[in-house]
Amino acid sequence: MKFQLYLGSLFSQIKVRYWWVSILLWIALVAPAQASVILRVAIERGVNQVKVGSSTTGVVKDSTGRTLGQLPAMSAYYAQAVPGGVALDKWQSGLFWIEPTGKGFVYIGDRWYRGRTLVVPTDKGLTAVNWVDDQEYLYSVLGGEMDSSWPQEALKAQAIAARTYALYERERQRNNPVYDLGNTPDRWQIYKGVISESPATYAAVDSTLGQVLTYKNRIILSVFHACSGGHTENVEDVWGSKEPYLRAVQDYDQNIRECNWVKTFLPSEISAKFPEVGSVTAMIPETYSPFRSVKVLKIVGNKGTKVLQGEDVRTALKLKSTRFTVTKGADGSFVLQGLGYGHALGMSQWGAYNLARQGVNHLQILGHYYQGVALTPIQAK
């Protein structure tokens, strides 16, 4: 299925089209070109169909690399799952590659990306994967994870942490035939494509080209979070496993509004989440980390008790963090007052921001949040 590719909804169709063309041209002219490691980033997973296209003429290839034809520039098509493979316009194959000509970009779902597109069938539907150079991937991730107006030293620290995390995932997923990592922030780094790039992200990524964090010659799990609320955590108090470089350290985020939060639950809301406990009568933090994050939360009802542990405390209740207190409101509600945003492991982004503003450089920031690590050039495989 073909249709003209108009991008956005806040402008008229004509204005939107030319606005996006100017953005694409600006990125193509300004962004520096570097080559290093290719990452496979799943943009759409397990879908029946996915919208694809190219900003320049797109070359369509099959699994053997044979060219099947071309997609016109700035037009989009639906790739659809069919028995035995994928259908795209007039072609049908086991899988499809879409490669832009020149310095073009690919379109997947609802965004523009660098690199090329692979559309492949899986047991759950179609998966659309962006094959992209790690530097170009990071141009986008950096703008998704941090405000590009932040100090360059904070952005450099984020660039190295994000590169390290991506290559850690690449190694961890080495037996996955389809992708290395995805693009959703609940599991991976924020990857929005070219829309989140800027000169500031180019500068931070390029100035740290090929640099990753290692511990005893192995790439580390360089997780990061928005803010911890004054102190990060030891990884074993959150995820159970122990890593010598993910140790609890003082944070520098206490002046950040986003790191202070309050959330109120009616008993009926908790009961709806955990119907097996019946009518909820109490929420009791039973075990704390040394830095007052809730490790075990007991939810008591008239039919039973539910025990949440570790990160399940935060994710099950959709809380910003696990560093909170519980009080009972006059109306019987449960009032949770907390500090921090995220799992409180590794680098605090707001902490990095404040440290950079005080003149601390990116290597000092990384050395503070990741204990005992070394800065190492990429050994690409």
Describe the residue ranges of each PLM region:
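Conserved, single-site charged/polar hotspot
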Residues: 2-381
